[in-house]
Structures are given as C-alpha cells and as structure tokens.
Amino acid sequence: MGNDAPLAVLSDKPQNLFSYFKQLFAQVSNPPLDPIREKMVTQMSILVGKRENLLSETSKHSELLKIERPIMLNEEISKLLDIENKGIKARRVSTLFDVQKGKEGFEEALSEIKSKTEELIQKNVSVIVLSDRGVDKNKAALPSLLVAGALHHHLIRSNLRDKVDLIYETGEAREVHHFAVLYGYGISAINPFIALDTVRDFSKPEDYKKNQENFCKASISGVLKTMSKMGISTLQGYMGAQQFEALGIGEKLIESSFKWTPSRIGGIGIEEICDDYLLFHKNAFSDSKIPSNLKLDLGGLYLWRGTGERHMWSPETISLLQKSSTQNDSETYQRFEEAANKDYYGDITIRNLLEIDYESSKPIELEEVESEIEILKRFATGAISLGSISREAHETLAVAMNRIGARSNTGEGGEDESRYTPDPNGDSRNSAVKQVASGRFGVTTNYLVNSKDIQIKMAQGAKPGEGGEIPGHKISDYIASIRKTTPGVELISPPPHHDIY
C-alpha cells in the first residue's frame, strides 16, 4: 500500500529484476505468525551441504554445515571457501558476463553457470558460492535473481538439487525484499558485500562492527516478517518455496527460470532484462567527466524527484488538491483532475491500461436501470478505526455517508455510544457497518445492535499478513473508553482472526 510509483513493467526507468516480484501473504487459508511475540517458534539458521537419501540412515546425513544467520559477512564467505572437511566442499562460480557480447554474452554466461555447477557437483562440491565480484568496465553482473531461479530449476530438472546448496555473494541485493526473493528461489545464504561495504563507509572505525551487525540483524528480522506473513516459521521451509507472484514477466522466462510462479499478464523476457542491466552498467562506468554525472542517481522510487521516477502524487498534484479543498475552488480542482489523470503522468497501474469502448456500447435508458438512491446504498467507506484517524474525521465520514444513504464503517476500534443517537440537526454519526476484528476492541451488545451490517474481519487488509499495534502512549482515556481497555496500555490485533478455525 502507498506505492504510487509505476509497476516495474510500466516504468520508463531500468528496473532490477526483484521489482517484478510481489510477496504473497496468508489470509484465511493458513494463519500468519506474529514474528515478534511468536519468535520462539521461528528459526533463521540453516544447514548447507549435500543431502543424502531420506530412506537410508548413515553418518553422511550429519555432514552438513550449520550457518547461524543467512546474511553472511565478507570474512565468513572466505572461511567457507577454505573448508574442505566431512562432506563440506565449497567453490566459487562467477556470474559475470562480457559487456561487449551483449545479449549473446548474457545468455552464454547463464548457460555456462549451469554447466560449471554440474561439473563441480560431479567433483563432490556440496556448496556453490555464486559471485558477482569483479565487475569492471568490460564485465557486468548477471541479475542475481535470474541466476538463482535459472540454476535452481535447472538442478531440479537434472535431479541434482539435493546434491548442493547455493550461496550468493552479490552486490545487487541490499533490501529485505531482495533477500526474501533470493531465498524464495533457492538461495541458502547471501553475502551482500556492497551493502556491507556501504555500512563500513558510513561508519566510524570504532562503530563499524556494531553497525554491520545491526544491518544483518535488521535484514534478517525483515525476512522473518516476510516469511511470517505466509505463516512460515523456518527459513529452511521458506527456501525455494517461491511465495511470490510475478507481475510483468513473460511466459517463456517463467517456464525456464521461475517455473510454477504465477504471472497473469505476461511481460518481458531475457532481452529486456539484459537491456536494463547493460544500462545500469553503462551508467556506472560512464566516460563523462562532468561532476554531476559522477554522483549516484537518487532514482526517486520512494520519494518524488524532478528527474526521477514518475509518481501519481507529486508536489503539483498535492498542491492543487490542498488548494482546491481549502479554498473550495472548483477551477483548481479541475486542474488537479487534469494533473492526476493517466495522460499526464503516463501509465502507472494496470487499470491505467483499461479503456471503455464507448463506440460499440449501446446506451441503456435511465428508466431501465436502478435509481441513484438504490445505487448509493452500496457505497461504503473503508474500515478505518478511530485512533488511526482523528475523532473529527471518523465522525465526519459517518455523517457524510448517512446523508447520501451510503454506509460508513467503524473499523476495529469500536465506536462512541453517544453517536447512536441522532444530533439535534438531524445528522447521524452512527456508522452503519460495525466491524468485529481479531482484537474485538469495543465490541459490546449495544455496539452490535446499532449496526445495519456486522463485518467480521478474517484478516488484515491495510497490513496484509500482519497484525496491528497501537503503542500505549496513544491510548488516551477517550480511546480506552471506546475500546473498553485500560489507558496507557498498548493494544495488539493478532495477525489472524482465531475464530476462523
């Protein structure tokens, strides 16, 4: 939620491959976990090495290496490559390709990685360290996710997947989502060396180790949170599980590298990905001597920048909306409409691509359709609890919906009983839809009988796969009285609604 930048497949800017994958989350099918309060049932350590036949029992089953955390430091990778003992044998495989060869070199390198890995497996190598170290003007890095997915599925098809574990030494992965997708497509551990080098560059010498540990800890916590949204408690169970949906990836690429991943709208292939990564490389090794060109491009993905990514909300649209609403100016609002429509900023979402075929449509007489009053009965606000928005906003929404014959929703925060009685001017602040959620805040008999609809929330909508939490300092006397709780005590909505069982 809240991402107003274009989908990766609709962006004018080059995109890393991670951007095309969206995380899945549990709703009613299986309950998500609370990664903070249920941490005792989770495990982020992993075992790497060759897996033996499950139906036999030999000492070789124990010839595995335990890695306590899946984000590895530079020195830990070096130590791993030095090990050659009790079935653990690690070798590095380069994931670079020749820039001059373009797409041909891109595909050649991908194919060579597969054959090189097979060759090493035949030599009893049990851990492959894929590495994109050594990038220079003539050598670029293959997309780490493409290498992971392609190799993972190649080994599955070759019946070799249980013979080896894959670890990635990559400068590309730097965010929690990047790590999660790599684990999801078969990578056991990651050494994000550029991210770690960046931490070092931003740290004082005496703080470097502590900051490095903080980065690793935060990254692992983020991956755990991502896993928890699907109700998966161990990283070993998440690895290779492919709990993602592709948005903008073509069928051919899905079949070769991301098999069994849903990709409902089709999209790009190897050629487009190669073009984007060659552009990344070209920008990194630009011949320009202009000082401004030597700075890293901010990109503007998360925050609007004049030369960055397009956004549905920009300084112009926000300014026009604020001015039109505060001054009740219809002319300014029309300018806001023009600035916010798709022709102004281009296609950002899938719905921007849809058009109504007015020419071949047959008009229906107004007498044959429902009246405005009947249609408005189906209009409803989102379920936004009192506390997440102010008392004034919550009550104003209810009054507005009641005036037009539509319905407002209390959200899961309860409702002031004084609102059940109409105001002297005839307005009603009573929300027609009363919500019962996992925390059951403010749910009383009086609350339920003053509703037109009772909405039982099976799972979180605004925070998919997560619960909600309000810190204690926000629980005022008024909020506590409505939620039937104690002032100053934090409130938690569990991720699942336990009545679903």
Q: What positions do the PLM features span?
A:
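Catalytic-face loop-and-helix region of soluble metabolic enzyme cores
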Residues: 160, 198-199, 205-209
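Flexible glycine-/small-residue-enriched beta->alpha junction loops
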Residues: 461, 466-490
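Flexible, glycine-rich loop/tail regions that form catalytic "lids" or insertion modules at the edges
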Residues: 1-107, 116-120, 124-127, 178-179, ...
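Conserved short loop/turn motifs at secondary-structure junctions
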Residues: 6, 131-140, 165-172, 383-387
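Catalytic cores of alpha/beta
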Residues: 172-186
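Conserved, mostly hydrophobic/aromatic
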Residues: 132, 151, 182, 234, ...
